[in-house]
């Protein structure tokens, strides 16, 4: 199989010589090739057994395997790992054998184990929390989705209190209110929110251009981060533009702001308790910023959030929506998969540019600019003004 080895080497060389967009294209091509070469049996086995990955990853996370193995200086045997982590030796051997088959770990020629890129990924707290959140909070919802839809004769899901989430967890509350009563389930979600991803909207957002002739008076707000969580956007803005005048305000619920105080700088960023389901108190700010907020709500609730901001705007104000913008055609699996998940749990959706513009128009807003900052999965800062 020298030809296969040569092709593999060529692909690795191509991946090393290109950017993230090129690597994504290579991944897509390889995935499409894999699917096209599968036998019917291969296809069914893949669909049936892919579910093992998150379950086994969760077990590895519970054991602390990924953190431990990523710190080991030499290959470890299954017995050594089992004894160190408090696991049955045969169980550890079987777990590692599966993990090696999907590259969660790497198996050496002498049947020992070292970390892989996936091991390193699952050792990062924010990314590990994302996997655990998916297992604990999303998997049960997706398992309930087929029966939920069949029982209702396959309607559109547009109500946050009438989704597969309620069926999965036997509750009449929406996802966020129910999770707030479940400290063990929401813990990983909170850690996930602290993960600071790069690149971010400031990678391509032309602040000076968007400021135009706007001039900051002492009490005038430059940037209001609505539902801004731990304040990452505010911090990044102040770090990149330390001399830019104007107030930078982080808004969220009081418990969130209390948690954020540990990471916020001592000066330059104000904390303001605010629920975005109520009218916006800061008048005439230049930028009202919403990052990954509206995707969590069905259209009617997302519209209400925008309508709570519009009365506070003046002619120079802009609402900046930082969110996913999947294409109408050729959306990638990560975008379409996210869409199915948030539909099932929240009654919401990933919106195309057309859908964002239609939603904003109902609130009296119009799109002025769109600045994409991730490829090929599209995340972008969309700038809206009053009509």
UniProtKB/Swiss-Prot annotation:
Domain of life: Eukaryota
Keyword tags: Methyltransferase, S-adenosyl-L-methionine, Transferase
EC number: 2.1.1.-
The keyword S-adenosyl-L-methionine is assigned to this record: yes
SUPFAM superfamilies: S-adenosyl-L-methionine-dependent methyltransferases (SSF53335), Winged helix' DNA-binding domain (SSF46785)
Gene that this polypeptide is encoded by: lepI
Protein task: O-methyltransferase; part of the gene cluster 23 that mediates the biosynthesis of a family of 2-pyridones known as leporins. The hybrid PKS-NRPS synthetase lepA and the enoyl reductase lepG are responsible for fusion of phenylalanine with a hexaketide and subsequent release of the stable tetramic acid precursor, pre-leporin C. Because lepA lacks a designated enoylreductase (ER) domain, the required activity is provided the enoyl reductase lepG. It is possible that the dehydrogenase lepF also participates in production of pre-leporin C.
Keyword Manganese: no
Any Pfam family matching the protein: Dimerisation
Protein name listed in UniProt: O-methyltransferase lepI
An annotated Gene Ontology molecular function: O-methyltransferase activity
Homology family: Belongs to the class I-like SAM-binding methyltransferase superfamily. Cation-independent O-methyltransferase family.
Region span, Substrate binding: 175-195
Ligand binding (substrate): 135-148
GO terms classed as biological process: methylation; secondary metabolite biosynthetic process
């Amino acid at each position: 199989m020298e030809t296969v080895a040569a092709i593999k080497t060529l692909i690795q060389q191509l991946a090393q010589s290109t950017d993230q967009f090129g690597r994504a294209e290579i991944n897509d091509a390889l995935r499409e090739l894999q699917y096209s070469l599968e036998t019917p049996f291969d296809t069914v086995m893949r669909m049936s057994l892919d579910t093992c990955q998150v379950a086994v990853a969760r077990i590895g996370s519970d054991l602390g395997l990924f953190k431990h193995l990523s710190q080991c200086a030499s290959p470890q045997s299954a017995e050594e790992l089992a004894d160190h982590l408090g696991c049955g030796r045969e169980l550890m051997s079987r777990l590692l054998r599966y993990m090696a088959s999907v590259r969660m770990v790497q198996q050496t020629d002498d049947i020992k184990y070292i970390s892989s890129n996936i091991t390193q990924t699952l050792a990062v707290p924010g990314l590990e929390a994302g996997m655990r959140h998916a297992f604990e909070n999303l998997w049960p919802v997706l398992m309930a989705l087929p029966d939920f839809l069949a029982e209702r004769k396959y309607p559109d899901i547009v109500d946050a209190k009438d989704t597969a989430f309620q069926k999965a967890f036997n509750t009449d509350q929406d996802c966020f209110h129910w999770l707030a009563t479940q400290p063990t389930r929401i813990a990983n979600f909170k850690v996930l929110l602290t993960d600071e991803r790069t690149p971010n909207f400031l990678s391509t957002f032309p602040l000076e251009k968007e400021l135009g002739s706007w001039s900051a008076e002492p009490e005038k707000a430059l940037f209001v981060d609505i539902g801004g969580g731990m304040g990452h956007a505010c911090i990044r803005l102040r770090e990149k533009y330390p001399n830019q005048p104007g107030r930078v305000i982080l808004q969220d619920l009081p418990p969130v702001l209390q948690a954020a105080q540990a990471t916020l700088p001592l000066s330059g960023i104000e904390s303001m308790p605010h629920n975005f389901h109520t009218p916006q108190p800061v008048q005439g700010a230049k930028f009202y910023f919403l990052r990954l907020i509206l995707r969590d709500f069905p259209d009617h609730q997302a519209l209400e959030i925008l309508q709570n901001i519009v009365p506070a705007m003046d002619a120079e104000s802009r609402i900046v929506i930082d969110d996913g913008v999947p294409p109408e055609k050729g959306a990638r699996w990560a975008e379409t998969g996210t869409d199915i998940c948030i539909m099932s749990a929240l009654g919401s959706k990933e919106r195309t540019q057309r859908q964002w513009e239609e939603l904003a128009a109902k609130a009296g807003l119009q799109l002025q600019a769109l600045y994409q900052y991730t490829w090929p999965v599209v995340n972008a800062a969309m700038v809206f003004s009053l009509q």
